[in-house]
UniProtKB/Swiss-Prot annotation:
<keyword id="KW-0009">Actin-binding</keyword>
<keyword id="KW-0206">Cytoskeleton</keyword>
<protein>
    <recommendedName>
        <fullName>Profilin-5</fullName>
    </recommendedName>
</protein>
<dbReference type="GO" id="GO:0030036">
    <property type="term" value="P:actin cytoskeleton organization"/>
</dbReference>
<dbReference type="GO" id="GO:0005634">
    <property type="term" value="C:nucleus"/>
</dbReference>
<dbReference type="GO" id="GO:0009524">
    <property type="term" value="C:phragmoplast"/>
</dbReference>
<dbReference type="Pfam" id="PF00235">
    <property type="entry name" value="Profilin"/>
</dbReference>
<dbReference type="GO" id="GO:0005856">
    <property type="term" value="C:cytoskeleton"/>
</dbReference>
<comment type="function">
    <text>Binds to actin monomers and regulates the organization of the actin cytoskeleton. At high concentrations, profilin prevents the polymerization of actin, whereas it enhances it at low concentrations. At low concentrations, associates with the poly-proline motif of formins to enhance actin filament elongation rate. Acts redundantly with PRF4 to regulate apical actin polymerization at the tip of pollen tube and control polarized pollen tube growth. Functions probably by favoring formin-mediated actin polymerization at pollen tube tips.</text>
</comment>
<dbReference type="GO" id="GO:0005739">
    <property type="term" value="C:mitochondrion"/>
</dbReference>
<dbReference type="InterPro" id="IPR048278">
    <property type="entry name" value="PFN"/>
</dbReference>
<keyword id="KW-0963">Cytoplasm</keyword>
<dbReference type="GO" id="GO:0003785">
    <property type="term" value="F:actin monomer binding"/>
</dbReference>
<dbReference type="InterPro" id="IPR027310">
    <property type="entry name" value="Profilin_CS"/>
</dbReference>
<comment type="subunit">
    <text>Occurs in many kinds of cells as a complex with monomeric actin in a 1:1 ratio.</text>
</comment>
<dbReference type="InterPro" id="IPR005455">
    <property type="entry name" value="PFN_euk"/>
</dbReference>
<dbReference type="GO" id="GO:0005737">
    <property type="term" value="C:cytoplasm"/>
</dbReference>
């Protein structure tokens, strides 16, 4: 399966609410910031933003004082899992990032999709990639 198929079929899929809702945007990005695959509307991020996100995985809490930025938009960092998941909130939406052995799985959402639905979609694929050694 191509990386793009993972994004299209496993991240931009129905979130399982029975109403056809899905994430706003999604991507799989290497630890070095290279884009492996992304949805058409995934925001154009700055390399430093990915560097800062990777640093927060290595040093949990690094982003908490300043917030997390993606494409210049600021997300308030909320509860995550050290070295595994970063979650952010911005207005009626937010972001979930799951770190795997070689990549990061990004999911962005807006209401009516809930944070829990985004977490489930992103972390399910991330866990699968970890199981596959990726």
């Amino acid at each position: 399966m191509s990386w793009q198929a993972y994004v299209d079929e496993h991240l931009m899929c129905d979130v399982g609410d029975g109403q056809g809702h899905h994430l706003t945007a999604a991507a799989i990005i290497g630890h070095d910031g290279s884009v492996w695959a992304q949805s058409a509307n995934f925001p154009q991020f700055k390399p430093q933003e990915i560097t800062d996100i990777m640093k927060d995985f290595d040093e949990p809490g690094h982003l908490a004082p300043t917030g997390m930025f993606l494409a210049g938009l600021k997300y308030m960092v909320i509860q995550g899992e050290p070295n595994a998941v970063i979650r952010g909130k911005k207005g009626a939406g937010g972001i979930t990032i799951k770190k795997t052995g070689q990549s990061m799985v990004f999911g962005l959402y807006e209401e009516p999709v809930t944070p829990g639905q985004c977490n489930m979609v992103v972390e399910r694929l991330g866990d699968y990639l970890i199981e596959q050694g990726l």
